């Protein structure tokens, strides 16, 4: 996900927990 690569988490993205 883009949010993971950019270092932030968009609504609905669980990359913060990955």
UniProtKB/Swiss-Prot annotation:
One MF term in the entry's GO annotations? toxin activity
Disulfide-bond pairs as recorded:
3-15, 4-13, 9-16
Task: Indicate yes or no for the key word DNA damage.
Answer: no
Subcellular localization? Secreted
The Gene Ontology CC terms held by the record are:
extracellular region
Entry keyword set: Disulfide bond, Secreted, Toxin
Tissue expression as described in the entry:
Expressed by the venom duct.
Q: Which family does it belong to?
A: Belongs to the conotoxin M superfamily.
**What does the domain comment read?**
The cysteine framework is III (CC-C-C-CC).
Q: What is this protein called?
A: Conotoxin pc3a
């Amino acid at each position: 996900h883009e949010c993971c690569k950019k270092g932030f988490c968009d609504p609905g993205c669980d990359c913060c927990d990955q």
